[in-house]
Regions:
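A general secondary-structure boundary signal
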Residues: 57-58, 81, 92-97, 112-114, ...
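Outer-membrane beta-barrel transmembrane domain signature
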Residues: 1-23, 41-43, 108-176
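Transmembrane beta-barrel domains of Gram-negative outer membranes and organellar outer membranes
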Residues: 1-91
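Residue-level signature of outer-membrane beta-barrel architecture
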Residues: 55-59, 86-88, 122-124, 166-170, ...
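Repeated loop/turn-to-beta-strand initiation elements of outer-membrane beta-barrel proteins
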Residues: 29-31, 59-65, 91-96, 128-131, ...
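Transmembrane beta-barrel strands of outer-membrane/channel proteins
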Residues: 32-38, 65-69, 82, 98-102, ...
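Sequence/structural signature of outer-membrane beta-barrel proteins
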Residues: 37-41, 68-74, 87, 91, ...
Length: 179
């Protein structure tokens, strides 16, 4: 099995595990986050879109949703999944967030990928800048649809990660960077 194939599966799984930066202290009930992720693997650059929708159902709980598709070469992958983001901390700050989400990547010719992510982050504020710093764990399962020497029939794994997010307000939008 190609090491490059395993890297692509792990990178795709980490891409699916991205959590939206929903400010627990914001008054908004609906959040829409759009962006792009890129990774450089063995001299190949991969770009993936990110679309996250969040609905704040209570002061300390949001429902997350990822449902979108895109064109990549001659394939049309679909991203389908949901999760919960829970905020806790002192009554006035809610400066911690815990996220659990399950996301599936379907529609590719050779494989499909399922991802379960658990993420814990702390919010920090510096003037109008917002930061999140935390840890997470991503559990994934890849299934190959056709017999190929490049991908295993089934690949399972876990990736632990450190997360850092940054955003700054720009009129009615927030401009940010996530890893």
């Amino acid at each position: 099995v190609s090491g490059n194939s395993r890297e692509i599966i792990r990178a795709s799984s980490l891409w699916l595990s991205g959590t939206p930066m929903i400010n627990p202290m914001a008054k908004n009930r609906f959040f829409f986050e759009i962006g792009s992720s890129s990774s450089l693997l063995t001299n190949n650059r991969y770009k993936y879109p990110n679309v996250d929708i969040g609905i704040k159902v209570t002061k300390n709980l949001s429902i997350l949703n990822k449902v979108f598709g895109f064109k990549a070469d001659n394939e049309y992958p679909q991203i389908i999944g949901a999760g919960l983001q829970y905020y806790f901390g002192s009554r006035d700050s809610l400066d911690w967030s815990a996220t659990v989400q399950r996301i599936n990547l379907k529609g590719l010719k050779y494989f499909s990928l399922s991802s379960l992510s658990i993420d814990l982050r702390k919010w920090y504020y510096l003037k109008s800048y917002k930061f999140r710093l935390g840890i997470g764990s991503n559990y994934f399962k890849e299934r190959t649809h056709t017999n190929t020497d490049v991908l295993p029939l089934l690949m399972k794994g876990q990736t632990n990660y450190l997360g850092f997010d940054f955003s700054l307000p720009l009129r009615t939008f927030n401009l940010g960077l996530e890893n």
